[in-house]
Amino acid sequence: MSDFVEIYEVGPRDGLQTEKRLIPTAAKVALIDLLSQTGFRRIEVASFVSPKWVPQMADSAEVMAQIHRVPGVRYTALTPNLRGFDAAKAAGADEVAIFGSASEGFSRANLNAGIAESLERFAPVAAAAKAAGIALRGYVSCVSDCPYDGPIAPGAVASVVAALRDIGCAEISLGDTIGRATPDRIDAMLMAVLNELPAGQLAVPPSATPATRPRRWRQCWQKKGFSPV
């Protein structure tokens, strides 16, 4: 097991985006400022998506303008398209993230596009990030199970990881989106993914059901070089 584990904090974005009650901008800023004092080196604070689809993130530019930035902390934003990237860049994002899926059904439901089309959409974002010298991170959802398509083949996950790697993602987070994976399924998926990207460039978010969480994550930590996020 690695002696170093980095925790990448996503609460201000992923944790808040589905809240039905609109949270005041000042409260979001206060949360991020507190997190900035805890020792996190990277915090995902905003999502530059259409407010029609994610109203909670409509004030992302204001949030990024008002936070008190701590030296050594990188503030990240989710940017699904070039318009979102341009807004994140203008807001001073230190890093941007794009998100895809290993499931066709989930991709169409959440991105209104199949896997291949969604990856094509990300290419201009990746190119713009590279030109601007802004680090690019990738997310892959449904790496084990999908609410629409059921179990996902390890090769399908590896294929999306390879595509995100090829367009410039320096790190890729593997999401067990609905928390149904088992240790054996995770192991098979990781073995396929590790053929495309080294462990040091992969992250694993701790989503799980209470019954599977302890066994799953003991096994993940044994994969040298993984960082939880």
Positions of predicted regions on the chain:
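Catalytic cores and adjacent flexible loops of soluble metabolic enzymes
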Residues: 1-229
